[in-house]
Amino acid sequence: MTETRTLQFESPRALQSLYANDIKLLKNLEDSLGVKVTTREGWVKLEGDSNHVDKAQQVFEQLEKARQQGVDIQKHEFNYALKAVSEERDENLGEVVSTKITTSSRKPPIVARSANQRAYVEAIQKHDVVFGIGPAGTGKTYLAVAMAVAALKKEQVARIILTRPAVEAGEALGFLPGDLEQKITPYLRPLYDALREMLEPEEMERAIARQTIEVAPLAYMRGRTLSNAFVILDEAQNTTTEQMFMLLTRIGLNSKCVVTGDVTQIDLPANKRSGVVEALQALKNVPGIATVYFTERDFVRHELVRAIIGAYQQHRSPAPSPRK
């Protein structure tokens, strides 16, 4: 049944703020939900199948509620609300983006971009060991680094330790030319990149020089006790079972450990079992440990990334066998 419905808003400016004053976003809503959208002054008219109009109204209601909660609605927020309604997910945009992490007085706070990201931040706040598992680009490492920097600034910990297995070199770094820093920097570059987005350059250099922030390969954690520290293990799918056990048993008093990885991207030799796969199974019922799983819905990179990954997955999936 075709229906026409008009929604009234407090002012033209308030309405325009719901779609970031970008008419392309309204076109995106039309294409996604199969409705016609007309807006003028402080109202918006929705035309189409009644079920589709219902969904379009839900999108505007979500956005208006978020606006009233103080959310600055931009392209990401609009598309997030649209996708949540399209997929019939019961998520509150305002609650999701109200989760903010302050890492520097000179830089804007880091904001959760999805319900899973919000759950991840809350899990890190409440638990001493957290596993963040899911595809690249979903914010696992970025949010963990933000939480670590925030904890350091609040003096909740005395240092940050960022580590990942240098699986590309089999962790046998000794044969590479240069000093230790020159050998390991290429493998740890993503962690440095995250830090640079959250700290001023001189602040980051000073913290690394004083070893308040330490970035090192996983092999260099052996034999240590990591007390009063926020430890992040990145690319954990490429740890062996022995390495994962080693790291988790290094955690000392007043420490947190966040382990991130993508179990679909394991680069270990075929005869080696991933340490994170074993840990997820062995530790699932241990109090004080939480696991948050991310999906393609949580992508925070360029919106084309989702389409690229989907296209590759479809291309690489085996073709069905012909019937005999």
What is the predicted function of each stretch?
Residues 105-115, 122-233, 237-324:
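Conserved helicase motor core of SF1/SF2 NTP-dependent helicases
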Residues 14-31:
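Short amphipathic alpha-helix segments
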Residues 82-113, 125:
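Proteins enriched for Cys/Gly/acidic motifs involved in redox and nucleic-acid/cofactor modification
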Residues 9-11, 39-41, 48, 164, ...:
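Flexible glycine-/small-residue-rich
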Residues 18, 56-59, 244:
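Hydrophobic side chains in well-ordered alpha-helices
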Residues 27, 33-36, 40-42:
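Compact, well-ordered interaction domains used in eukaryotic information-processing assemblies
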Residues 1-16:
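Short glycine-/aliphatic-rich beta-strand segments at the starts of folded cytosolic domains
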Residues 38-97:
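Interdomain "pre-motor" coupling segment immediately N-terminal to P-loop NTPase/helicase cores
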